[in-house]
Amino acid sequence: MKLCWQKSIHGS
């Protein structure tokens, strides 16, 4: 799932 790396780039 892209959401996986999406959270990484966000670094929330």
From Swiss-Prot:
Q: What is this protein called?
A: Early nodulin-40
Q: In the record, what lineage is assigned to the organism producing the protein?
A: Eukaryota, Viridiplantae, Streptophyta, Embryophyta, Tracheophyta
Q: Name one GO biological process term.
A: nodulation
What the protein does comes down to:
Modulates the action of auxin, and may function as plant growth regulator that alters phytohormone responses.
InterPro entries in the record, alphabetically? ENOD40
Pfam family name, one: ENOD40
Q: Which UniProt keywords apply?
A: Nodulation
Q: Please report the organism this UniProt entry assigns to the protein.
A: Sesbania rostrata
